Amino acid sequence: SQSARNLVGMIVRDVRMAGFKYFNDTIKETNDHIPIKITKSKNFNTDCDKIEIVYGDAVANASKNPPYTYERFRVSYFCERSKIVDKAKSGGNTVYIDAFAIYKKKEKWDANSSSWKNPDTDTLVGSSVKDERTYSKEKVVDYVQDLVFHAIDENGKLISPPPTATNSTKEFVYKIKTVDIAVTKRSRKEFFKESKIRTKKSLEDDKRDIKKTDKYLRESIIISANTRNLGLL
């Protein structure tokens, strides 16, 4: 669907920003600043994978010395169960469709408290004006069946588990060459005339294959996003 393609394009653009910062950046690095953090789903019926992407930016003010204030942002993509009511199944009780919604959130780093600011209340540098660049979770697309992220190294091999600042693959934190992304979405309305079991293969993990007996059409969009700012160290 077009909405799923738009989502994938958005994620690709953010992945390409992962790890970017200006050469004179003065923000002290912490474990919260790893460029890409992928959290794998533990229950495919209730959750999808999650990705957090961190990159830097700068605000210029010629009247100040130094003229630049450096910033750090974190963008997250994650799933929650859909809140769309399944009208065909809802009688006395409210029943939601068997799908996920994908959300996006953007936060800004607070160097003073060494924590991510609340995007609902954070402000522009040196101002009391709300920073409109950040936001709490915003729904991007619904009717999603799964969202998968895989960290891939320079040899095209899957990094498993995905690296964090402290786990067994932490030496690969800055060696993620690409991120494989798979989004599977179902049609809003029934598509096929006949209801029968249909299987949609998952990316790299047979346990995540989607097997449903219904009339809905399911399509997967799979793409590899290059991390152009990683692997340079």
Which role does the model predict for each range below?
Residues 42-44, 129-233:
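Short linear sequence signals and composition-biased patches located at protein termini or domain-edge surfaces
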Residues 1-131, 141, 227-228, 233:
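Extracytoplasmic beta-strand-rich oligomerization domains located immediately C-terminal to a leader/signal peptide
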